[in-house]
Amino acid sequence: MILLDGTIVNIAIPDVLTSFQTGFSQVEWVMNAYLLAFAVLLITTGRFGDLYGRKLFFILGGLFFTLASLACGLAPTIGWLIGFRALQGLGGAMMMPNTLSIIANVFMPEERGKAMGFWGAVSGVSLALGPSLGGVLVDTASWRWIFIINVPIGILLIVLAFHFVPESTDPLSVKQIDYPGVAVLTIALFALSFALIEGQKYGWASSLILGLFTVAVVGLVLFILIQRRQVQPLMDLSLFRNRTFSVTNAVAALLMFGMMGVFFLLPVFLQAILGYSAIKAGLVMTPLAAIVIVASPLSGILSDRIGQRWLMFGGMLIAALGFYLTRRVMVMDGSWQSMVVPFVISGFGIGMVTPPSTSAVMGSVVPEKAGQASGVISSVRQIGSLLGIAVMGAVLQNRAVSYLRTGIGDKLDAAPFVLPPGAKEEILDAVASSAVNMGEMRAGGGIGASLPEGVAGSLSQMPASVAGQVADFFRDLFSMDFIMGEFAHAMRTTYLFSVIIMVVGALLATAVSARVKRTRGSGP
């Protein structure tokens, strides 16, 4: 349910934009509110489960997730939806770490591998089914049903867990909860996310955005200092002294950074720009997710034979190639057939990286540190996802505004009539303030549904002989084809950024030890 929710929501992004007639940055918060709560609380809720009962926290998490899902489906405004998504993230963070602890407690050592394999298979199926199931729900019902569908599933989960899952604790493994670390990391990541997502709106050089970047930097420094002084820190920084551990975590973060940024933008391109239905967009995206299921076990087998370094290196480069080829077919007259091969290549590369990165991290630590290492890489991956959506969204908004200002400015310079004084700058300022609001554009017919009041008044006073010419000019200037063409251009630039991220990750992977032996008892 948790993993399915992570992929099913992406396909509903364009409909959420239209439903609330909101901006792209607000929809980024729909994703990042969930990821922020999930990433920061993942390790802490796992430790609460060890202290007070894994079954208890699993059921409480299921209850939180189910109620928050219902609230998301009924949300009256985008603000309420964002808040309820954060509660969903809390529920997910309470459930996820305790699922693995419950499996480890319920199954005997000789059966544990099979149980973990089944857990992984369910995770893979959830990843593959998310886009197509989301498309069906959005087109046949409403985007709200991608959340409401969790309610009966959640109720069933709670009932089954209550009756069939035994309670277990491990209080000796937890000496204290790192509340200061949780608080400081939450503030730092929130400040960084807000600055990246809202920078285009408030201005990158504004005191608010610069202040938030400062808070993020200071917060991260304080977090490191707190971790060094805690008896049982949220993240054991001593683990990062191991080169393989630190580099592999960086590679894992970059993979999720590039992957989630791409997964977030792709449904918008398919639906808002190519005009695909949600069902069609979901089906088109399915090969990208499904091929991960094929590549992951293959990569896991190969990592035991040839080592993790070159699998991670090759996988990141293959994913970079897939993203680059996807970028080339992101054009206004693109077809779904042209996207199949790039999607398959991208999915294969992603699947090649995940198992060896997990294996390298778990094999680089002593058995006593395996639980902490697992928690660190899980949190690092979620933080990578969080920043990927924020940064890629910021790049898209910045480039979209820039390209639209340039394109519209060139057209205004070539206008067959003389514009009123100051009209060009007023129009371009209006473009800058509304270009990122794709929801209003899709619902209202374009940026130019209404000209700035002063410009409209001046144009209405122009001679009747040119009135028709003026109307035709502005109708063409603000046509949806032109606007969406510039957005497609901005998305191609954004995808190029993701290609660079994956190449950097590939280069980092070469610093991993040639073959990391999995330490006995160090986990899956």
Predicted feature locations:
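Transmembrane core module of solute transporters
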Residues: 1-38, 42, 80, 122, ...
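Cytoplasmic loop-to-transmembrane helix junctions
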Residues: 26, 111-118, 369-376
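Helix-loop-helix hairpins in multi-pass membrane proteins, especially solute transporters
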Residues: 42, 46-181, 207-208, 304
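Small-residue-rich alpha-helical segments with characteristic i,i+4
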Residues: 123, 129-131, 339-438, 510
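Helix-loop junctions on the cytosolic side of multi-pass membrane transporters
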Residues: 159-179, 202, 225-234, 331-332, ...
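Transmembrane-helix exit segments and adjacent C-terminal regions of multi-pass membrane proteins
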Residues: 222-225, 232, 244, 359, ...
